[in-house]
Amino acid sequence: MTFADLDNVVLLQSPALARLTDEEFFDLCQLNPTVRLERAADHNIIFMPPAGSESSRKSGEVHGQLWLWNRERRLGHVYESSAGFTLPDGSVRSPDAAWLSQAAFEELTEAQRQRFPPVCPAFVVEVRSPSDGLAPLRRKMETYLANGVQLGFLLDPGNETAYIYRPGVNPEEITGFDRELDAEPVLPGFRLDLRPLRQG
């Protein structure tokens, strides 16, 4: 068993862990609720550093705005960072906020919904905390796109920079959190207000 520290993300490499089934990995996560675990496509386990209270507040703000929009529109379902999704490449990822269309949700069985469902959200958001390296987050966003995400926001509140990811084009970089990010056409009518994410 070996450990690799990549931009403050700890990767646990072990042949035994790489052989875990989807069900066994889910059970591992349930047995360790105080640790946020993800799984790479090669089945190596990723330990995510815990976020501080301010980072958690900002992630909660994003999730809250998305939840309020979805409550009004009722076009799908909203998830926060404790939810994991088993992507087509076999990785299991947990965005800070995610939205799944109603059509995609209805294709899942009840048993799948209770675990890490084999589905890729249409929209994801990652919020960078001071302990997060930017490079692994950008790689994570590329993984989302490669697996079917239609729109992704990578938010860096410390530098007031947002990166918008869409399939087939380079990420768009936006500076300044005195604005809203438009999620059309994936999320009709949703605009993420960045001002509550500013420092202080």
Where on the chain are the PLM-derived regions?
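Gly/Pro/Ser/Thr-rich low-complexity, intrinsically disordered segments predominantly at protein N-termini
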Residues: 1-200
